Amino acid sequence: MNRTNKLILGAVVLGSALLAGCSSNAKIDQLSSDVQTLSAKVDQLSNDVNAMRSDVQAAKDDAARANQRLDNKVLRICK
C-alpha cells in the first residue's frame, strides 16, 4: 500500500469510529431519557397506590361501621 492509500484507509477508520461513537452517544442519551421517563411513571404509580391504600382503608372503615349498625339492629329485633 502506498502512503495515500494508508491515509485514506486511516481516515475511513477514524471517520467510522467517530460516527460509531456519535451513534452510541445518541443511544445512551435516548436510554437515559427513557430511564427518566420510567422513573417518573414509577413515582406516579407509587403515589397512586398510596392514594388507593387510604381509599381502601376508608372503605373498610365504612363497611365495618355499616356492619356494626346492622348487628345492632338485629340485636334489637331479636330481643
From Swiss-Prot:
Signal sequence region: 1-21
UniProt key word Membrane: yes
GO cellular component, one term: cell outer membrane
PROSITE patterns the record matches: PROKAR_LIPOPROTEIN
Similarity section: Belongs to the Lpp family.
Any one GO molecular function term: lipid binding
Induction: This gene is probably poorly expressed.
Modified positions (N6-murein peptidoglycan lysine) in chain numbering: K79
Described function: A highly abundant outer membrane lipoprotein that controls the distance between the inner and outer membranes. The only protein known to be covalently linked to the peptidoglycan network (PGN). Also non-covalently binds the PGN. The link between the cell outer membrane and PGN contributes to maintenance of the structural and functional integrity of the cell envelope, and maintains the correct distance between the PGN and the outer membrane.
Lineage: Bacteria, Pseudomonadati, Pseudomonadota, Gammaproteobacteria, Enterobacterales
Major site of localization recorded for this protein: membrane
Species annotation: Salmonella paratyphi A (strain ATCC 9150 / SARB42)
Coiled-coil features, chain-numbered ranges: 28-76
GO biological process assignments: lipid modification; periplasmic space organization
Lipid attachment locations (N-palmitoyl cysteine): C22
Protein name, entry field: Major outer membrane lipoprotein Lpp 3
Subunit relationships: Homotrimer.
Keywords: Cell outer membrane, Cell wall, Coiled coil, Lipoprotein, Membrane, Palmitate, Peptidoglycan-anchor, Repeat, Secreted, Signal
Statement: the UniProt record of this protein carries the keyword Repeat: yes
